[in-house]
């Protein structure tokens, strides 16, 4: 699915700019699992084949992330490639930022207490104007990229560029690249209005 031709610009901006995505998978015997992942959005113009001398034409956009090969998510994708991804940038990052105290400070405990109180007060006073109105759920088909391939190296490099703080998850041993082909997007707002983009497909 090529998103920029089918969904509103604000929705595309949310998918491109969110820091994390909730990834829902299900085992072959229907046991669900959810994980929070660093990810990147890769447009059809940025996919690996566009940078190689390939005659194949791929007009799809993808969500790319890494998983550990011993994880439940990896095992689930191997047995059941149908996944759901939740994007919900529910609050601006600056409102969640708490300043760190210097490690040389003598009143560490009082600092933690005051910052904790500040954060609790912030959550208590949170109002609707500080919340984004839209969340998006993507249904897609996940594919495990060969970890020894040039494609895997290419996507790891992109992931690391966008998420330099997640190098242990991107470059760690026994990790694999997961590439999700987007099939359908369902958008919901605070008033329970919903819109659907893409076509419903039969599960793999």
Curated annotation (Swiss-Prot):
FMN binds at residues 65-66, 127. Gene3D superfamilies: Electron Transport, Fmn-binding Protein, Chain A (2.30.110.10). Its cofactor is FMN. Binds 1 FMN per subunit. The keyword Flavoprotein applies. GO terms for cellular component: cytoplasm; nucleus. Present with 589 molecules/cell in log phase SD medium. Belongs to the pyridoxamine 5'-phosphate oxidase family. PANTHER family: PYRIDOXAMINE 5'-PHOSPHATE OXIDASE YLR456W HOMOLOG-RELATED. This is Pyridoxamine 5'-phosphate oxidase YLR456W homolog.
